[in-house]
């Protein structure tokens, strides 16, 4: 445990994710809410929600309140609302999404900004002004599109998606059937 506390937050976050539940619980027991929050701050939202899901309701609340990045804390809290064996419980909030009304240069600029917060870019999703999924964007289509083009002109309107309440085994079946690395998760709104 002493050695664990000597590691920086990024390394300890990685270690926490690799430990089995029993060993992770032992470590989390001795860390303060602030120390756990520092580790959680280094994780993607889906991983952070998995770790926090193992804590008591009271401890979870304390840790969430200590996370410095308020938006990150809100995203994690959102994910904790979903049962772990549903699409909502599996999803990550880190993604690249673009608005259908943006021009190509605006899109590229905004994607650069979003990409700094994302570990991997599997897909680029297109949404409308109400954040409703409208399609996906191919990087190739974006690169060859004229600068004056709107994203709605180059987007691919057909996109497979699942509902937040879809069971995880059904999500896996759909992803395997269509050979997908990622699939957008949408709510009823």
Show which residues each predicted segment covers.
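Hydrophobic packing positions in regular secondary-structure scaffolds
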Residues: 1-189
């Amino acid at each position: 445990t002493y050695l664990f506390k000597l590691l920086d937050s990024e390394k300890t976050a990685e270690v926490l994710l690799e430990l089995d539940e029993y060993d992770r619980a032992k470590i989390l027991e001795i860390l303060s809410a602030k120390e756990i929050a520092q580790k959680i701050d280094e994780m993607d939202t889906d991983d952070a929600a998995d770790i926090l899901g193992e804590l008591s309701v009271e401890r979870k609340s304390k840790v969430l309140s200590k996370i410095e990045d308020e938006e990150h804390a809100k995203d994690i809290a959102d994910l904790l609302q979903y049962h772990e064996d549903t699409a909502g419980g599996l999803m990550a909030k880190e993604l690249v999404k673009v608005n259908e009304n943006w021009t190509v240069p605006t899109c590229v600029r905004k994607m650069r900004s979003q990409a700094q917060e994302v570990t991997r870019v599997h897909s680029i999703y297109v949404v409308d002004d109400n954040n409703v999924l409208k399609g996906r964007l191919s990087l190739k289509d974006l690169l060859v599109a004229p600068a004056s083009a709107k994203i709605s002109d180059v987007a691919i309107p057909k996109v497979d998606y699942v509902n937040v309440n879809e069971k995880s085994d059904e999500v896996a079946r759909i992803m395997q059937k269509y050979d997908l690395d990622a699939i957008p998760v949408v709510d009823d709104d």
